[in-house]
From Swiss-Prot:
Protein name, entry field: Cytochrome P450 71D181
SUPFAM superfamilies in the cross-refs: Cytochrome P450
One matching Pfam family: p450
Upregulation: Slightly repressed by Spodoptera littoralis, a herbivory insect.
Stretches assigned to coiled coil: none
Tissues with expression: Expressed at low levels in flowers, leaves and stems.
Primary enzyme class: oxidoreductase
Cofactor: heme
Any Gene Ontology CC annotation: membrane
Signal peptide (from-to): none
Organism whose genome encodes this protein: Origanum vulgare
Family label: Belongs to the cytochrome P450 family.
Length: 496
């Protein structure tokens, strides 16, 4: 009995504390906040996130309360942006104000205390790492120079599918291996020995770095922080990550040269680490954080987009036939096509854009409002977490006819691109924090997809129809398929 009374007392004290803090914070909020659903004591709107993926639930909220909505998730105030107009104002007009990131337990542990580029705060460290990344890895010249790597890895992938003719094969797994190898060879000069384990860690980490952990939403609660079991799971994952990256970096130190016979980006980072004139020191943790960035943003997003493109084409056989017909006409007689040849295939570009519209690599883009400002007439308080619902914008009937339908032909009538200028379609973000690797990523999607459509006829496993396909997504920062894509390849015979 005494124990029960003690627990009740503890719960009452904790609840009273949170209620008091919520009222104190609410009293300091400006009056002209965006619309908000009714909320509960202590948890605010947290209960509304039950029963679905965050991007789906948040779309329902903004459809009811407006494209800009204010939410209290635990202790944390957030604003959801779900329109092209509000997103343009935040990411273009007020870009410096919204260029920051907020912390999460997942990003702090797995991305080395946000000492990377993706999750870094908007500061000199971020500017320095991004500049190195763009100049040494992601310039248009470098993207073109990686053509032979794409050709090598595509040849390997084609051999894998040729050896499985007529047999169901896990296409998701093989495409992920190919994407991983391309990025490793381009960035680091060789394929990592443990790249499979690293790819698995990336998928797991992206699923746990969304910022929706209870400890993320109640940052002042030492008890929830202590009881956050995912934190201990993440620390075990981080130890495995350290073991892999430490081994790779040690091998890198003793090797003489990479695939290109000269410096790769790791060599550049090590050279700059020794430069005493750098305003911001480059630490070993920063180098490891950058490597994990390359994997999480470079391999997972390209592989996921190819898998979704094939999934949508398999679900829409008439679109698949049209895409294959154009690819085979444009690439006829060409061996080892790369970016220059694929650029001529208009319908393929439309397929990729339509895939990115329906399945953006990062459905919710996290930002942090640095100082109080106004967006579409509403006041956004300083330090408010911003969630740009890219997934919802891409399915908004105000911008897209039949928005939930996969229809690449829509781009014959609608001139929109994915490079951050058209805010109805921003799968790579926009503004100064737009994904620096978008051209590299697009090349690593379009070239492999073209070759897979050129060389093979694709069928679903026996007894399965397009209507039976599971198009569910996995929870987390990225939006990969929940279940692997299983297909049956048959070699295309041009003379038949």
């Amino acid at each position: 009995m005494d124990i029960s009374i003690s627990w009740v007392a503890i719960i009452l004290v904790i609840s009273s504390y949170f209620i008091f803090m919520n009222k104190w914070r609410a009293a300091k909020l400006p009056e002209n906040l965006p619309p908000s659903p009714p909320k509960l004591p202590v948890i605010g709107h947290l209960h509304l996130l039950r029963g679905g993926l965050p991007q789906h639930v948040l779309r329902g909220i903004t459809q009811k309360y407006g494209a800009v909505a204010h939410l209290q998730l635990g202790e944390v105030y957030s604003v959801v942006l779900s329109s092209a107009e509000s997103t343009k104002q935040a990411m273009k007009v007020l870009d410096p104000t919204f260029a920051d990131r907020f912390d999460s337990i997942g990003s702090q542990i797995m991305w080395y205390n946000n000492n990377d580029m993706i999750f870094s705060r908007y500061n000199d460290h971020w500017r320095q790492i991004r500049k190195i990344c763009v100049s040494e890895l992601l310039s248009p010249k470098n993207v073109r120079s990686f053509g032979f790597i794409r050709q090598d890895e595509m040849a390997r992938l084609i051999r894998v599918f040729e050896s499985s003719v007529g047999v169901p094969i896990n296409a998701s797994e093989e495409i992920s291996k190919m994407s991983c190898a391309i990025v490793c060879r381009a960035a680091f000069g060789s394929v990592l020995k443990d790249q499979g384990l690293l790819a698995d860690l990336v998928k797991e980490a992206l699923g746990m770095a969304s910022g929706f952990e209870l400890a993320d939403l109640y940052p002042s609660s030492w008890l929830l922080n202590l009881l956050c079991f995912n934190k201990y799971r993440l620390r075990r994952m981080r130890q495995r990550l350290d073991d892999i990256l430490d081994g790779f970096l040690e091998e890198h130190r003793v090797k003489k040269s990479g695939e290109f016979g000269g410096e790769d980006i790791i060599d550049v980072l090590y050279r700059m680490q020794k430069d005493s004139e750098n305003k911001v020191p480059i630490t070993n943790s920063g180098i490891k954080g950058f490597i994990f960035d390359v994997f999480s943003a470079g391999t997972e997003t390209s592989a996921t987009t190819i898998q979704w493109a094939l999934s949508e084409l398999m679900k829409n056989p008439e679109k698949l036939a049209k895409a294959q017909a154009e690819v085979r006409e444009k690439l006829k007689g060409k061996t080892n096509p790369d970016v220059a040849e694929v650029q001529e295939i208009k319908y393929l570009h439309s397929v990729v854009k339509e895939t990115l519209r329906l399945h953006p690599p990062f459905p919710l883009i996290p930002r942090l409002c640095k100082e109080e400002c106004e967006v579409t007439g509403y006041t956004i308080p300083a330090k408010t977490r911003i969630l740009v619902n890219v997934w919802s914008i891409g399915r908004d009937p105000a911008y897209w006819k039949d928005p939930d339908t996969f229809n690449p032909d829509r781009f014959d009538e609608v001139s929109r691109d994915v490079i951050g200028n058209d805010f109805e379609l921003i799968p790579f973000g926009a503004g100064r924090r737009i994904c620096p690797g978008l051209h590299f990523g697009l090349a690593n999607v379009e070239v492999p997809l073209a070759q897979l459509l050129y060389h093979f006829e694709w069928k679903l496993p026996q007894g399965m129809t397009p209507a039976d396909m599971d198009m569910s997504e996995t929870p987390g920062l990225s939006g990969p398929r929940k279940n692997p894509l299983i297909m049956v390849p048959t070699i295309h015979n041009p003379t038949s």
